[in-house]
Amino acid sequence: MTDSHYLDRAREKLIVALDFWEVEDARKLVRKLGDEVSFYKVGLGLQLVGGNEFAKELIVEGKRVFLDYKYYDIEETVQRAVAQAAELKITFLTVHGVASIMKAAVAGRGNSDMKILGVTVLTSMDAEDIKEMGFDGKVEDLVIARAKKALEVGVDGVVASALEAAELRKQTSNKLMIVSPGIRPSGGARHDQKRVATPFEAIRAGADYLVLGRPIYAADDPKAAAQAIIQEMADALRPD
């Protein structure tokens, strides 16, 4: 395979998080990145300032959109909200990794092509954090339990740290898509992330998609930062 083959595959797997509070700031980053990035995450920061309309704008421009609103409400509300998101032609949508919520999301998705992702444990959390939530044991055990439930109720994948990706592959018979945030280039600052991996480590561990925000949008040259990350991902995809 040629280098361009692995670079193209890596580009498909990179999701850039638009963690802004104003749509215009997100729009400026998208312009800077140009054709280098085709997949963007729109989260809660943009939700109340036109996030849905901006998502439509991105889709019209040929971009894929990961709507990361992490729905968590009564089943009927989740089902209806997911149905509305499906009408936007969203690619990925997150809901909390609770069985009843995920089941409602699958029902709301209907026959659309939108993929539902169950959030397992945030990468900003560690064992101490889940202990405060009332869960004893390892973070990995909770992630695996929620992933198995996700598979059981019919969602398409999970959001999980790359640190758990390899074990997730084993425990779910490779049947769930794994989307991994908490990705930091070698030597990069962790910021608010506690369970992190490099792009190379994440791809080798079995993550299907990587979500990166600050390492790209806070860089002096966001496009060059994205290109470096894509190269590292491509290196991981290339057989030894």
UniProtKB/Swiss-Prot annotation:
Its EC number is 4.1.1.23. It comes from the Bacteria. Belongs to the OMP decarboxylase family. Type 1 subfamily. SMART domains: OMPdecase. The active site is at K70 (proton donor). GO terms for molecular function: orotidine-5'-phosphate decarboxylase activity. It comes from Nitrobacter hamburgensis (strain DSM 10229 / NCIMB 13809 / X14). Gene3D superfamilies: Aldolase class I. It catalyses: orotidine 5'-phosphate + H(+) = UMP + CO2. GO terms for cellular component: cytosol. HAMAP family: OMPdecase_type1_B (MF_01200_B). SUPFAM superfamilies: Ribulose-phoshate binding barrel. This is Orotidine 5'-phosphate decarboxylase. Pathway: Pyrimidine metabolism; UMP biosynthesis via de novo pathway; UMP from orotate: step 2/2. Keywords: Decarboxylase, Lyase, Pyrimidine biosynthesis.
